[in-house]
Amino acid sequence: MNYLSSFGELLESFFSDKNQSENPKLTQAIEDAEKFNSWFSKTNIINALKYWMVKLRKDTLETWISKYSLQNVNYKVAVIMAGNFPLAGLHDLICVIISGNRAIIKPSSDDKILINFFVEFLHEKFPETNEIIEIASEKLGDFDKVIATGSNNTFNYFE
């Protein structure tokens, strides 16, 4: 959970200090995501990041997971992410991490910049997350469970 709350703290610092120059990587990711996907306005991206800023506060995470009996089963869970809004697949990824499993993610081609920023942040700050989260570059193969969101087209990953 510290991995996740650490990202929430990064976002809180980014937005509360109004000193965005202290995190040029996040500033660049926001700009790149807006340029890459014309459906993602800067306002939509900022709103999504602010949403996750609140949801990834340590107390909010603790309240959320306290309702569940979590078991560390260590499945390899493939997460095929939608890209219809900024960070659409982040909830699924967070659920995999919190439940004690490993994630192999296939970011949507429409929303890979922000998701990749999240994963790279975790990998840099917490090197042990390299064993927990993998970004797949090819068609997914070796997994125990799968979460697929998006349209009916998502089914094509399984044919």
Region annotations inferred by a language model:
Residues 17, 32, 59, 92, ...:
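Acidic-enriched, low-complexity/disordered segments with a strong bias for Aspartate over Glutamate
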Residues 61-125, 129:
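Conserved small-residue-rich beta-alpha loop and adjacent elements
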Residues 29-32, 36, 102, 130, ...:
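Generic preference for well-ordered secondary structure
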Residues 55, 95-103, 136-141, 158:
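Short, surface-exposed, charge-dense and proline/glycine-enriched linear segments
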Residues 1-78:
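N-terminal Rossmann-like NAD(P)+-binding subdomain of aldehyde/semialdehyde dehydrogenases
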